[in-house]
């Protein structure tokens, strides 16, 4: 089991500059001093809240900043041209000595509508994008398909890692079986309930029973963390931070959804952290991605990072 960082980059009652500075400082800290942290992922949505509009650009900066960590980005590929994503991924793979992780996810309805994509073929568009990207990465070439019309071309620079480039798919009800057929690891949605994550994992395993080798697949579990000796303070900070959830779940009771998230993430005291980590086994996760962004006190963040070294030996090793 390894630890990683996960950045939503939502500027809750603070400036974008401060949010990005906190991300940079946290990544620099764990890259230098905490060997049990192996990855850092940057999330992206075209929304009123997210401030990383170009996740691969952010990843390239963090790759240049660090020496050891693997850096990844979750890219909404349906609203971008797959050849451009393949080019950028191949370039980052070469320049980072294969430390780049390619994370892929689909769009919410707002993104599909804004960029004039058809909702009724959304998953088919996603799969078509992925096929082009993966072909370009693994063979250095790609060609058109049902949704894209261009001649067979060479992607430059060529990807050095090819099929060994780490790839992750954001878990969803429409993508999980498709991901399992390709033995692609999942990054679970932080906003899904543990029960939903567990259902997706079981669906993944059910598909994998049909002669698909997933023995080396390492799913990732994102966990919002806010620990404080005063549980009420942790709850207040985390509640304020995730209040944007109304954008993602406008049809739900917002107070109820926020309370649900607080209960299922590591929000509260140290004991809440230990109990939440038990969820990893239920979802087949081998990596846990921690988001400290709701915590106001940097010293408290460092304390939690130090906790991870002490508890790592108690986590599943396979």
UniProtKB/Swiss-Prot annotation:
Keyword annotations of the record: Flavoprotein, FMN, Luminescence, Monooxygenase, Oxidoreductase, Photoprotein
GO biological process: bioluminescence
Catalytic activities: a long-chain fatty aldehyde + FMNH2 + O2 = a long-chain fatty acid + hnu + FMN + H2O + 2 H(+)
Gene3D superfamilies reported in the protein's UniProt record: Luciferase-like domain (3.20.20.30)
One Pfam family in the UniProt entry: Bac_luciferase
InterPro entries per UniProt: Alkanal_monooxygenase, Bact_Lucif_Oxidored, Bacterial_luciferase_CS, Luciferase-like_dom, Luciferase-like_sf, Luciferase_bac/NFP
Domain of life: Bacteria
One MF annotation (Gene Ontology) recorded for this entry: alkanal monooxygenase (FMN-linked) activity
EC id: 1.14.14.3
GO cellular component annotations of the record: cytosol
CDD domains the UniProt entry points to: Alkanal_monooxygenase
Quaternary organization: Heterodimer of an alpha and a beta chain.
PANTHER family for the chain: BLR5498 PROTEIN (PTHR30137:SF8), LUCIFERASE-LIKE MONOOXYGENASE (PTHR30137)
Function: Light-emitting reaction in luminous bacteria. The specific role of the beta subunit is unknown, but it is absolutely required for bioluminescence activity.
Membership in a protein family: Belongs to the bacterial luciferase oxidoreductase family.
Protein name: Alkanal monooxygenase beta chain
Lineage per the UniProt record: Bacteria, Pseudomonadati, Pseudomonadota, Gammaproteobacteria, Vibrionales
């Amino acid at each position: 089991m390894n630890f990683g960082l996960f950045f939503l980059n939502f500027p809750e009652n603070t400036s974008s500059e401060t949010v990005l500075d906190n991300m940079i400082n946290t990544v620099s800290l764990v890259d230098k001093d905490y060997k049990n942290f192996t990855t850092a992922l940057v999330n992206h949505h075209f929304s009123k809240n997210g401030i990383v509009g170009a996740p691969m650009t952010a990843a390239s900066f963090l790759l240049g900043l660090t020496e050891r960590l693997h850096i990844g980005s979750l890219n909404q590929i349906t609203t971008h041209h797959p050849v451009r994503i393949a080019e950028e991924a191949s370039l980052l793979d070469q320049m980072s000595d294969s430390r780049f992780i390619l994370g892929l996810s689909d769009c919410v309805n707002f993104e599909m509508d804004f960029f004039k994509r058809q909702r009724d073929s959304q998953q088919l568009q996603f799969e078509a994008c992925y096929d082009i990207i993966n072909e370009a990465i693994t063979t250095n070439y790609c060609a058109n398909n049902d949704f894209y019309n261009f001649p067979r071309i060479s992607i430059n620079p060529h990807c050095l890692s090819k099929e060994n480039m780490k790839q992750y798919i954001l878990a969803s009800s429409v993508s999980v079986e498709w991901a399992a057929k390709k033995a692609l690891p999942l990054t679970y949605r932080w906003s899904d309930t543990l029960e939903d994550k567990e259902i997706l994992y079981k669906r993944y395993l059910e598909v994998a029973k049909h002669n698909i080798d997933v023995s080396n697949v390492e799913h990732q579990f994102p966990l919002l963390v806010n620990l404080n000796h005063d549980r009420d303070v942790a709850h207040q900070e985390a509640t304020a931070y995730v209040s944007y959830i109304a954008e993602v779940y406008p049809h739900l009771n917002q107070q109820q959804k926020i309370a649900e998230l607080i209960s299922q993430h590591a929000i509260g005291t140290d004991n809440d952290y230990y109990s939440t980590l038990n969820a990893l086994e239920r979802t087949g996760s081998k990596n846990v991605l921690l988001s400290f962004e709701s915590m106001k006190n940097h010293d408290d963040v460092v304390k939690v990072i130090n906790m991870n070294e002490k508890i790592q030996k108690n986590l599943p090793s396979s």
